[in-house]
């Protein structure tokens, strides 16, 4: 069975394995092509052994390569009051970093 880990970054959790491409919240001071180290590993599975952190697995690290900065889907908010000719439409697009997971150090 394939090894994987569950990491936490940007107050969100992701299940990752080698070769996966994920979109994470923006991180400060990172440029394209740079290696990113995720050290908040909550759970690991290497094919036979399970390691569950309390809350973090010691000495477990997930490394990834920054591919690009992307934008998420547009979220539209619409306010409306009946009979008052009042309506407001606003939108928001979140910026993300696209990261390719290169190595799991379990």
Curated annotation (Swiss-Prot):
Pfam families per UniProt: Ribosomal_L21p
Q: Biological process (GO) annotations? A: translation
Report the GO molecular function annotations: rRNA binding; structural constituent of ribosome
Please provide the record's keywords in A-Z order. Ribonucleoprotein, Ribosomal protein, RNA-binding, rRNA-binding
Q: Which GO terms describe its cellular component?
A: cytoplasm; ribonucleoprotein complex; ribosome
InterPro entries referenced in this protein's UniProt entry, alphabetically: bL21-like, bL21-like_sf, Ribosomal_bL21, Ribosomal_bL21_CS
**Alphabetized NCBIfam families for the sequence:** L21
Query: Oligomeric state and partners?
Result: Part of the 50S ribosomal subunit. Contacts protein L20.
Return the similarity comment: Belongs to the bacterial ribosomal protein bL21 family.
Q: What does this protein do?
A: This protein binds to 23S rRNA in the presence of protein L20.
Name the record gives this protein: Large ribosomal subunit protein bL21
């Amino acid at each position: 069975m394939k090894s994987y880990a569950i990491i936490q970054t940007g107050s969100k959790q992701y299940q990752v394995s080698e070769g996966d491409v994920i979109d994470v919240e923006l991180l400060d001071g990172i440029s394209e092509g740079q290696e990113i180290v995720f050290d908040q590993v909550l759970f690991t599975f290497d094919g036979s052994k399970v390691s569950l952190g309390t809350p973090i697995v010691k000495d477990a690290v997930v490394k990834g390569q920054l591919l690009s900065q992307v934008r998420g889907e547009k979220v539209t908010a619409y306010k409306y009051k009946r009979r008052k000719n009042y309506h407001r439409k606003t939108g928001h697009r979140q910026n993300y970093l696209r990261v390719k997971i290169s190595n799991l150090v379990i």
